[in-house]
């Protein structure tokens, strides 16, 4: 499945991650380096499988762990109303 960021999301990139602000809810969220990479790929309209494949190439991680981490972060971004299905 593909997701897209909501238009009302502001992003500030930090040295070790990013901070996201949902202008609708007025809440902010912090992401670590992996979460930030996932956010970047969502903005490029990558699907969940592509995101997992990219993490497997870029990080030393086993596939089950990468899949679980991607799903967890996507679920958190959905719950925070920062992304929606594309």
Predicted regions and their residues:
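Acidic, low-complexity/disordered tracts enriched in E/D and polar residues
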Residues: 1-36, 40, 86
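Long, charge-rich, low-complexity alpha-helical segments
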Residues: 27-86
């Amino acid at each position: 499945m593909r997701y897209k960021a909501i238009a009302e999301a502001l992003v500030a990139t930090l040295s070790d991650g990013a901070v996201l602000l949902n202008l609708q809810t007025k809440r902010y969220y912090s992401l670590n380096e992996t979460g930030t990479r996932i956010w970047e790929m969502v903005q490029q309209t990558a699907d969940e499988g592509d995101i997992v494949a990219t993490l497997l190439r870029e990080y030393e991680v086993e596939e089950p762990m990468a899949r679980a981490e991607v799903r967890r972060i996507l679920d958190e971004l959905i719950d925070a109303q920062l992304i929606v299905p594309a």
